[in-house]
């Protein structure tokens, strides 16, 4: 057994703490917020999207990005900047848009997602967490025939990875999401992913925090992390505003903030904050609300059903750590909701939110060892934090405890990047 400090209490940090504790370690979680999941894990889409696990870096994206620059409601926005971190990240992302790299990255992401599904299933079977979860799948809807044609290659990868799916015509889409009936003329078909789930991300994190406490995990909230202190290639502590915290091993699970903490150690990880937005609406008419998750392929916006709310989330904006919510981004999110489910939610009572998704240029998280003998990472999950959280945490616990995991062959640690250390 080792004493382990987990830095970060979003869904990835919390699940890391849980699986490390289950492996027999003495775990403490450190976070600057007063409770877990107060930042990127707070109000995102609420999807557990095993079948939709796919990198943003894909064939055709460079051309689409140029087109999107001129569109009002584009799914990707780039704020002009000479930030070296942004330029470097974008360059790496462009390289990963090659078909061969996309296929490798998507296969790797699907493997993590499928493993994570089994981990979450086992967790729920044992502890019966209640987070307004629904196991009713994801419906990816298409607005033009080109999207239907383009999805064929993804379907091949889904089949190879053992992910269940079904290509649907519009009438079949309505059997899963009858609330789309008033706008069916806008659609040409859809892809049904029956094993996907939804739920209140924040509620899941709060319940897991309490469960972890019962298992002996300690939490230092309202504790600001300043730097990692090392001697040679070993970490000897974490300097915080509460003093120097020491352990046998350290896990960096700080999402987009992992990069700045690791950089003084000479560790360069390509994790960039890709800003996302959400709108939460009270449901006013259930028959016109989504039943599970509807993913609008045109605008890359997800509409997810909770018990009495609709969560509309999407867009990707490269703007650093700017916390502002521009009216233009609000307009895009609201437009998609009004376009697909105009009568389902109370737009007058809608609440907007933004968060910083920790995105890698290849879409795959960075899980595992570092050049420092007792330092580990679990970050870079992008839009798939909850989807991959339990599996990633289990992988991390295996690597920290045994030196490898069943998925080590995938090359998930930072050493897959030539200049990571």
UniProtKB/Swiss-Prot annotation:
It catalyses: a D-alpha-amino acid + A + H2O = a 2-oxocarboxylate + AH2 + NH4(+). It is an enzyme of class 1 (oxidoreductase). Its EC number is 1.4.99.-. Keywords: FAD, Flavoprotein, Oxidoreductase. Its cofactor is FAD. Pathway: Amino-acid degradation; D-alanine degradation; NH(3) and pyruvate from D-alanine: step 1/1. The keyword Flavoprotein applies. One of its GO terms (biological process) is D-alanine catabolic process. This is D-amino acid dehydrogenase. It comes from Vibrio cholerae serotype O1 (strain ATCC 39541 / Classical Ogawa 395 / O395).
């Amino acid at each position: 057994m080792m004493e382990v400090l987990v830095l970060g209490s979003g869904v990835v940090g919390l699940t890391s703490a849980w699986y490390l504790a289950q492996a027999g370690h003495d775990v403490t979680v450190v976070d600057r917020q007063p409770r877990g999941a107060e930042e990127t894990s707070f109000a995102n889409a609420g999807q557990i999207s095993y079948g939709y696990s796919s990198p943003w870096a894909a064939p055709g994206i460079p051309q689409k990005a140029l087109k999107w620059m001129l569109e009002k409601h584009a799914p990707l926005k780039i704020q002009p900047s000479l930030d070296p971190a942004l330029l470097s990240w974008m360059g790496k992302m462009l390289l990963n848009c090659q078909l061969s790299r996309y296929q490798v990255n998507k296969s790797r992401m699907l493997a993590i997602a499928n493993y994570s599904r089994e981990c979450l299933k086992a967790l729920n079977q044992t502890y019966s967490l209640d987070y307004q979860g629904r196991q009713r799948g994801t419906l990816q809807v298409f607005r033009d025939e080109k999207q239907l044609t383009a999805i064929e290659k993804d379907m091949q990868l889904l089949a190879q990875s053992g992910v269940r799916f079904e290509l649907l015509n519009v009438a079949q889409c309505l059997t899963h999401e009858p609330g789309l009936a008033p706008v069916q003329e806008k659609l040409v078909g859809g892809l049904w992913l029956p094993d996907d789930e939804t739920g209140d991300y924040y509620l899941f994190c709060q319940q897991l925090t309490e469960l972890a406490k019962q298992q002996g995990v300690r939490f230092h909230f309202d504790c600001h992390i300043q730097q990692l202190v090392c001697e040679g290639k070993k970490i000897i502590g974490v300097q915080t505003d509460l003093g120097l915290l020491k352990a046998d091993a350290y896990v960096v699970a700080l999402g987009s903030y992992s990069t700045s903490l690791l950089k003084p150690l000479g560790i360069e990880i390509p994790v960039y904050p890709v800003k996302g937005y959400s709108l939460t609406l009270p449901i006013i008419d259930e028959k016109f609300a989504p039943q599970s998750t509807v993913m609008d392929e045109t605008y890359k916006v997800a509409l997810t059903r909770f018990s009495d709310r609709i969560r509309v989330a999407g867009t990707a904006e490269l703007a650093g750590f700017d916390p502002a919510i521009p009216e233009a981004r609000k307009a895009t999110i609201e437009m998609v909701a009004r376009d697909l489910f105009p009568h389902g939610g109370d737009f007058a009572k809608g609440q907007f939110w933004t968060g910083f998704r920790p995105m890698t240029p290849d879409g795959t998280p960075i899980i595992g060892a570092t050049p420092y003998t007792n330092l580990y990472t679990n970050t870079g999950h992008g839009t798939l934090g909850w989807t991959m959280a339990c599996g990633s945490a289990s992988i991390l616990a295996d690597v920290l405890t045994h030196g490898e995991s069943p998925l080590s062959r995938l090359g998930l640690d930072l050493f897959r990047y030539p200049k990571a250390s």
